Amino acid sequence: MEKAYRIKKNTDFQTIYKRGKSVANRQFVVYTYNSNKDHFRLGISVSKKLGNAVTRNRIKRAIRENFKIHKEDIIARDIIVIARQPAKDMTTLEIQGSLEHVLKIAKVFNKKIK
């Protein structure tokens, strides 16, 4: 994912946490905040409580891949995805399905996704 699509600064994360709206399921919490950009920006948070670096990076890769697949279908917003404990035991396809579910609830897609 290109640099323009990333949220890295702590101040950006804090703004989205405070002013954004949150939606959750068992595996993920998603914060969304309307931005003035012409595309979405993504921040990913995976706690050390979820496992070692290999496990955390696998979860982050699966989340990033899901956003790459739906890049054209996502509304221009700042989005933060926080992984919860059950996500560590899921396969990439299960992560994709669960993430799509919570993103539909958050109304981040600009059209219907199967």
Curated annotation (Swiss-Prot):
It comes from the Bacteria. Keywords: Endonuclease, Hydrolase, Nuclease, RNA-binding, tRNA processing. It holds the Pfam family Ribonuclease_P. It catalyses: Endonucleolytic cleavage of RNA, removing 5'-extranucleotides from tRNA precursor. The keyword tRNA processing applies. PROSITE patterns: RIBONUCLEASE_P (PS00648). Its EC number is 3.1.26.5. GO terms for cellular component: ribonuclease P complex. One of its GO terms (biological process) is tRNA 5'-leader removal. GO terms for molecular function: 3'-tRNA processing endoribonuclease activity; ribonuclease P activity; tRNA binding. Consists of a catalytic RNA component (M1 or rnpB) and a protein subunit. RNaseP catalyzes the removal of the 5'-leader sequence from pre-tRNA to produce the mature 5'-terminus. It can also cleave other RNA substrates such as 4.5S RNA. The protein component plays an auxiliary but essential role in vivo by binding to the 5'-leader sequence and broadening the substrate specificity of the ribozyme. Belongs to the RnpA family. This is Ribonuclease P protein component. It comes from Staphylococcus haemolyticus (strain JCSC1435).
